[in-house]
Amino acid sequence: DGFVPQMQAWLRDRGADVTLVNAGVSGDTTAGGAARLDWSLSGPVDALIVNLGGNDLLRGLDPAVSRDNLEKILKGARSRGLPVLLVGLQASTNYGPDFKLRFDAMYPELAARYGALLLTSYFAPLMPESQTALDRNLMQADGIHPNAEGVKRIVAAMGPKVLDLLAEVGPPAQ
C-alpha cells in the first residue's frame, strides 16, 4: 500500500512500462539523500523523483541547509542529464513566518533554476478543500505519514507529473 507500489500500478494502468526504484530511507533528510546520490544513481537510471525535506522540516533544520542539499541532488542529476520531478512541501507556521517563507520558496526556486518539473505540494491532496490542515482520516496514527488511502490520493495527484517526467526521458538507460 506504499507510495512506490501504488505509483507503479498507476503508471502501468496508463500504459507506462517503467520500473520505479525506491532509493529513499525511512527518516531520511536532504543531507542523507545528497550523501547517497552517487550510490542511488549507480545503476541504470532514466529520471529522478526527489521527495525530500519533510524530515528536515520536522527537525527544524535551517531551510538554507535543506536548500543546499537539494541543490547538490539537482546538480548531480543535471550532470548526468537526468530529468527531475521535485516534490515540494510547505512548512507550518510553528517555526515562524521567516522560516516558512524560506522553506516554502526553496522548491519552486530550485525547480526553476535547474529546469526540474515541480509538484508544488506533496500533501495538498490530503487537505480538505479550503483547509490548511491534513485530513486525519488519510493519515497513519503518527499523524505524519499518509495511510493507504492518503497515498492513493497523492499518487492520483502526482501521477500526471510523473507522466510528464517520463515524456522527458530519452532512450532507456543501459
Predicted segment positions?
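Glycine- and acidic-residue-enriched helix-capping/strand-helix junction motifs
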Residues: 1-2
